[in-house]
């Protein structure tokens, strides 16, 4: 049997004993007397234990024990001062207290630590590890929002003004009550009403400006994240897009980026507003009555503990309800889907009983959920009413002693009603921020992903012959590395010649075209262009010299001109029309209402299939490439358009690779390559 690790507890006792010895000696004489000295002693003790245990790497075991251990005594003595009067509260020091007091302190702290551990939900250690990872994501989001810092500062400024106005309204409400309850002063009454209206209008205006700044910040962050993510996606290798579903990428670009952009402004708004509200409200409450202010904090630990217990049980019952509803749905699907079998065996009543039992389980779980909710609300309400009764009792005593007025007590009660929700927000906001930042993890993983591509090439010669050589080229797709598509291909494509690549479906013809465009990297061998590896050429230069027309051309929403000149930095209209004429696309373009500026619709939806094919060929010809790849593109062309393409080929010494099925295209080729199962089967010179 493995013994538990006692090092954290031994270290805690030794370090605490050393700190108490220091606080009992010369260091303790420097501390003030009374409650301030007691709180300062507890703070120094907490800081010392925290720092020394963290230095030794033992904080994670006993970290939650330190807070009740060090601050239980100051809190207890402070509460005694509130109930019995400050003059009779014992100004004790933990360092000079008897050992029995220390044992009681350790026992109470250990009991609270054990209770907290029992109430912790299962998987707390894994959750802590997730929060560590989320902290890294949180800091990355903050850095990503750095350009919007001026807007956030402006939003914080308006936030402070809005909160200040909201906080001052109850103050002047109390002034109005005091004026109406005493000797009526018209000038003082008018002044109080004026300031109430002024601060109401000012807080509303400031709140609107605050919301505008945060909303504008969200839109800027959203655009920045989407731009960076889209830029990163376009740089990825094609293997990434084969492994990742398009719907998932759309989800990251739309919903996840929106969640990321909303994270900082919304959480900063809630956090800063709650923080300023708590500071402002407690400032006013302390100015009215310090004793009532401390009493208002009495129910906070109990409320937080009750909420922790409720949330743990609530999450558990929600999971059980989800499972029970799924089981009930499964009964319905099985019965309806196999209705013929149910009737053939006369099992209708049996299925009804099964469904009734499943519904009964759901009903019991719903009842348990509602009962626990009611008990939780009852506990919160009883705690809240108990503290309010205690405060009203103390407030009445202070009014009788002349320390408070009716208006001051009313203002204090208004402040106390709203401050509790802001304190709870501050307690839970950090955990919520860490939990909600998880949407950024996948987005950042895409942005950080390095494409499986060689280093960018730099070759961009002024002249290019267009000699293409495949030297013992083999290839397998990244998602299927054990299934090679090409196996040791060796052939040459020469300028001025048309090479026909034929073979059955799945033989690797389109893969040859993809390798020639440097869309994939061979797993073996080399693809050479003018005796240089094709990966050494500069990206834009290569794709201006090696151009492909696919079997199913892809057009983009926009004008005819934009689609033909797609990817070119500058292209004159005359050059666009010349390419369209060479592809026999000028006839239908001239018949359009706006000519080359006519919108083709999404994916070219306004065009026929043959028209799309001609625009795709014009898009290739406008670049005047040295190497042209026709991936079964001629199959959608008529004879006249195909003849125009042959005329374009005959006007220069270009290298043309045609992936074809038509006999007419093969007969006009200078060279025929036959692929079958990734191997070159036949090489015929015509």
Swiss-Prot record:
The protein's enzyme class: translocase
InterPro entries xref list: AAA+_ATPase (IPR003593), ABC1_TM_dom (IPR011527), ABC1_TM_sf (IPR036640), ABC_Tap-like (IPR013305), ABC_transporter-like_ATP-bd (IPR003439), ABC_transporter-like_CS (IPR017871), P-loop_NTPase (IPR027417), Tap2/ABCB3 (IPR005293)
Membrane topology: Multi-pass membrane protein
Effect of substituting residue 16 to K: Complete loss of interaction with TAPBP, resulting in impaired PLC assembly and antigen presentation
Substitution effect: residue 467 to I: In allele TAP2*01F and allele TAP2*02D
Chief location of this protein within or outside the cell: endoplasmic reticulum
Function, in words: ABC transporter associated with antigen processing. In complex with TAP1 mediates unidirectional translocation of peptide antigens from cytosol to endoplasmic reticulum (ER) for loading onto MHC class I (MHCI) molecules. Uses the chemical energy of ATP to export peptides against the concentration gradient. During the transport cycle alternates between 'inward-facing' state with peptide binding site facing the cytosol to 'outward-facing' state with peptide binding site facing the ER lumen.
Protein name per Swiss-Prot or TrEMBL: Antigen peptide transporter 2
Organism expressing this protein natively: Homo sapiens
Gene for this chain: TAP2
């Amino acid at each position: 049997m493995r013994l538990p690790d006692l090092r954290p507890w031994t270290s805690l006792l030794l370090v605490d004993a050393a700190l108490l010895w220091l606080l009992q000696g010369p260091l303790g004489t420097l501390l003030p007397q009374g409650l301030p000295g007691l709180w300062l002693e507890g703070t120094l003790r907490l800081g010392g234990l925290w720092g020394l245990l963290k230095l030794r790497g033992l904080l994670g075991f006993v970290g939650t024990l330190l807070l009740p251990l060090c601050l239980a005594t100051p809190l207890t003595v402070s509460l005694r001062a509130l109930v019995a009067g400050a003059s009779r509260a014992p100004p004790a020091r933990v360092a000079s207290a008897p050992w029995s007091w220390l044992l009681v302190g350790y026992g109470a702290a250990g009991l609270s630590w054990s209770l907290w551990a029992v109430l912790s939900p299962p998987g707390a250690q894994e959750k802590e590890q997730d929060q560590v990872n989320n902290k890294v994501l949180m800091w990355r989001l903050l850095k990503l929002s750095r350009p919007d810092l001026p807007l956030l500062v402006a939003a914080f400024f308006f936030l402070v003004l809005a909160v200040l106005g909201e906080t001052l309204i109850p103050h002047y409400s109390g002034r109005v009550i005091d004026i109406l309850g005493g000797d009526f002063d018209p000038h003082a009454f008018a002044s109080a009403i004026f300031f109430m209206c002024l601060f109401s209008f000012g807080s509303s205006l400031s709140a609107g400006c605050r919301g505008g700044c945060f909303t504008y910040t969200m839109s800027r962050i959203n655009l920045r994240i989407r731009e960076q993510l889209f830029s990163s996606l376009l740089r990825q290798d094609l293997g990434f897009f084969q492994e990742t579903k398009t719907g998932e990428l759309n989800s990251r670009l739309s919903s996840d980026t929106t969640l990321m952009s909303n994270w900082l402004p919304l959480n900063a708004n809630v956090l800063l507003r709650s923080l300023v509200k708590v500071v402002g409200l407690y400032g006013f409450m302390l100015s009215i009555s310090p004793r009532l202010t401390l009493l208002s904090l009495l129910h906070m630990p109990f409320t937080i503990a009750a909420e922790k217990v409720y949330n743990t049980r609530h999450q558990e019952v929600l999971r059980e309800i989800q499972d029970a509803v799924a089981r009930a749905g499964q009964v319905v699907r099985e019965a309806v889907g196999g209705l013929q079998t149910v009737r053939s065996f006369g099992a209708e009543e049996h299925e009804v009983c099964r469904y009734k039992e499943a519904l009964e389980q759901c009903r019991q779980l719903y009842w348990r959920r509602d009962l626990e909710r009611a008990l939780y609300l009852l506990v919160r309400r009883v705690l809240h009413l108990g503290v309010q009764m205690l405060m009203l009792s103390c407030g009445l005593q202070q009014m009788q002693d002349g320390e408070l007025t009716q208006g001051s007590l009313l203002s204090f009660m208004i402040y106390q009603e709203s401050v509790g929700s802001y304190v709870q927000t501050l307690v839970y906001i950090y955990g919520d921020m860490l939990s909600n930042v998880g949407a950024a993890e996948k987005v950042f993983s895409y942005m950080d992903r390095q494409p499986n591509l060689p280093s960018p090439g730099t070759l961009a010669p002024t002249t290019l012959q267009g000699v293409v050589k495949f030297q013992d080229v083999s290839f397998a797709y990244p998602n299927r590395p054990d299934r090679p598509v090409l196996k040791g291909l060796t052939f040459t494509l020469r300028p001025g010649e048309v090479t026909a690549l034929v073979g059955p479906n799945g033989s690797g013809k389109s893969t040859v075209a993809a390798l020639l465009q440097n869309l994939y990297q061979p797993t073996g061998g080399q693809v050479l262009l003018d005796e240089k590896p094709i990966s050494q050429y500069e990206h834009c230069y290569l794709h201006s010299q090696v151009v492909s027309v696919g079997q199913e051309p892809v057009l983009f929403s926009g004008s005819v001109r934009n689609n033909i000149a797609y990817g070119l930095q500058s292209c004159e209209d005359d050059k666009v029309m010349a390419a369209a004429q060479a592809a026999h696309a000028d006839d239908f373009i001239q018949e359009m209402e706006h000519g080359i500026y006519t919108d083709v619709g999404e994916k070219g939806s306004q065009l026929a299939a043959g028209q799309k094919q001609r625009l795709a060929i014009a898009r290739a010809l406008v670049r005047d490439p040295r190497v042209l790849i026709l991936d079964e593109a001629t199959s959608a062309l008529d004879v006249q358009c195909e003849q125009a393409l042959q005329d374009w080929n005959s006007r220069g010494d270009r290298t043309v690779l045609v992936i074809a099925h038509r006999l007419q295209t093969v007969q006009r080729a200078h060279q025929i390559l036959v692929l079958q199962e990734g191997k070159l089967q036949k090489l015929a010179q015509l």
